[in-house]
């Protein structure tokens, strides 16, 4: 199965519309072909993933248990920190940017 990361949110005034864009995209992806990895970027620029990201009713304050994740340059793997150590979360095969505005659709 292909791991598909969908990035949404962001550090700008279009943060909320980007969440809607990301969730709309996710709702149309064939889950039999792709393992969807939602990656939410909060207004501080921190990245998170977790199942609670798939429900719009959880935004912005009810995101439950999320993993704070990040990428390493020239690597297609999301990592998280546990007990002060970097741990592998998942390899990303394809990434889709559903970001709007500065630090998003500007590249």
Positions of predicted regions on the chain:
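ATP-binding N-terminal substructure of ATP-dependent carboxylate-amine bond-forming enzymes
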Residues: 1-107
């Amino acid at each position: 199965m292909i791991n598909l990361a969908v990035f949404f949110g962001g550090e700008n005034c279009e943060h909320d519309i980007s969440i809607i864009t990301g969730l709309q995209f996710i709702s149309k992806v064939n889950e039999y072909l792709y393992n969807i990895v939602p990656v939410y970027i909060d207004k501080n620029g921190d990245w998170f993933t977790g199942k609670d990201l798939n429900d719009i009713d959880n935004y912005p304050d009810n995101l439950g248990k999320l993993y704070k994740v990040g990428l390493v340059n020239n690597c297609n793997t999301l990592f998280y920190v546990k007990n002060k150590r970097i741990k592998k979360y998942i390899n990303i095969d394809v990434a889709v940017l559903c970001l709007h505005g500065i630090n998003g659709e500007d590249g």
